[in-house]
Amino acid sequence: MKRMVFDVPATASGALTVLEEYYKRAVKSANTGVQWTFVISTPEMEETENVRVLRYPWVKKSWLHRLFFDCFVAPQLVRKQNPDEILSLENVTIPFVRKFKQVLYVHQSLPFVEYKFGFKENMLYWTYQNIIGRFIIRSIRKADEIIVQTNWMKEACCQKAKVSPSKIRVEPPELNIEVKKYFTLEASSLRTFFYPASPNSHKNHRIILEACKKLKELGIDDYRVVLTLNGHENEYALELYEKAQRDGLPIEFIGSLKREEVYEWYSKSVLIFPSYIETFGLPLLEAKLHKAPIIASDTLFSHEILDDYENVWFFEPFDAD
């Protein structure tokens, strides 16, 4: 069997994690008779006996390069390789190749969440919800099979795209964690709040700063908040950093961490997770496995992961009180 995997957008964060999971799965399947071809952009992946890697780094130069690749190069590659199955990890199917079976992995949640972005508020997110989202929904209808990470995404896809639940299967992210140290109940750990998140507005760091400012006005400052930002990643991060410094808030910007370093923080802090747009919310599961206390946004994705967990408190992600 020949399986062709497309994921040229993936370069970092959750998208890259999904790609790496399938690559590892392909390498481990060397004795199953399945030949894999991965079509990617910039990630470095080694070829093996049953895995071939086709890299197209120029795809990342601009949206026009990506559009050209999607409309012309990708269909041509499919016809040339003649696979038994296409697996698209790009949230949309490969166009103009109807005779080939297509499995679509949908992990972009923006078109399906309740919160709607205004054009002036965030032009990119508005575009995903109102333009790219239409292509995602159309692809869900066209694909032979759909894979999502959570039950709430399955229900949302069924509702938005009007497809049968039998067409969609749920595959939670594989999380092979060797927990070396569980959360330790100490005064310092209960006063330390940790938020591992990228510098994007939907991660909702701002609500943390608002809450810290309110606590300062009440004379409460015997705690610390640790963010995995350095304050210089983009305008959003710089705005957060300058506000925290200006208001004298007990917030530390420690920069990005390796995965093992993140796990170490789970053992000595409370996870605070105010993000209101996620497909899965991986830190929630990671902290749960480390038995850490969690303060999470009151959202569908949070409840799906944490409703069976005792050490969690939910809050309204737009209310600093």
Where do the model's predicted regions map?
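Conserved donor-binding/catalytic core segment of Leloir-type glycosyltransferases
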Residues: 186-203, 209-212, 226
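Aromatic "clamp/platform" in nucleotide-sugar-dependent glycosyltransferases that forms part
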Residues: 276
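Nucleotide-activated donor-binding/catalytic signature segment of Leloir-type glycosyltransferases, i.e.
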Residues: 237-260
